[in-house]
Amino acid sequence: MNRRDVLRLMLTTALAATIWPGSKAASGLVEGRMTKSTMPVIFLAHGSPMLLDSRRWVAELKQWADAMPRPRAVLMVSAHWDQRPVALGATRTVPLVYDFYGFPDRYYQVTYPAPGAPELSSRVRELLKGANTDFMDEADRGLDHGAYVPMKCMYPEADMPTLQLSLPGLDPATVYALGQALAPLREEGILIIGSGFLTHNLRALSAETPAWAAEFDGWIADVLLRNDIDALLDYRTRAPGVQYALPTHEHFVPVILAKGAVSDAHLATTFPITGFVGGSLTRRSVQFG
C-alpha cells in the first residue's frame, strides 16, 4: 500500500460513512428568499471530498448555514486556488474541478450545479479596482472541492449563486488586504467564505491528536478571540508548532482573508465547529459577526 492509499484509508476511518444524496439543480434564487441583511464572514474547515461521508460534519455545516441569514450570494475563497493576479471564476454553471487524485470513482461523480453570480462578479471588480488590485478572469473555472464540498452541505439545493475568487498568493499582508477590499460585501447581503484548514499536515495523520496540533489550534483560537491582527499576520514566526501544523500555508491563509473582511473589531468571534479529524487536522471553523 503506497502513502496515498494509507492517507486515504486513515481519513476514511476517521469519518462516519454514509451515502450523500444527490441534490436538485435550481435555476437561481427566488426573489422572496433574498436578503440584504448584514452577513457574518466565515472561515470553514472543508475536509476532503470524503467530508460528504460524515453525517456529523454535514449536519454541522447545514445547521451553521441555517443559523445565519440567507445570503443573496456567496463569495468563496478556497485554499485550492492560488493565482496571481487575483482571478474571478465562472459566472455561469460550469463543471466542477475535481482537484484530487486516487479516490474512489463516486467522488468524481458528485455534482453541484449552483447558479453563477454575474452581478456579484461585477461588484467584486468594482471593489478590486477601488483598491488598485489587479485581477483577471477565468471564465471556465468551476468550483474546486474546497468550494463545492462545503457548499453542498450548507446549501444542498444548489440554488445559491456562487462566485469563486482565487487567493492572491500566500503573503499574509496581501491576503489580509484583499479581505479588507471585499469587506463592503457583507453589508450587501453577501456571505464571504474562506475555506481551508487551520492545521494541514497530511503526513501526520494518526489516531491521536499530537500535542503540537492541539497547541497550534489553541493558539489560533486565542489570537482570533483577542483580535490580535499582528500575531495573525506574523503566525509563521509566532505560532507554536507551526512547522508541523503547516508544512505549506495555502490552507491557513483563507482565515486571514476572512478576518480582513471584518472591519469591526468588536464583532463577536465564535467557533461553530471544533474538534479534530485524522488526529492532526483541526476542524475549527470561525464566524466573525
Q: Across the structure, where does each feature detected by a protein language model lie?
A:
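N-terminal secretory signal peptides and thylakoid transit peptides that target proteins
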Residues: 1-14
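Signal peptide processing junction and immediate N-terminal pro/mature segment
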Residues: 24-28
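Beta-strand elements within well-structured catalytic alpha/beta cores of enzymes
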Residues: 40-44, 73-78, 165, 185-198, ...
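Internal, conserved structured core segments that host functional sites
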Residues: 121-175
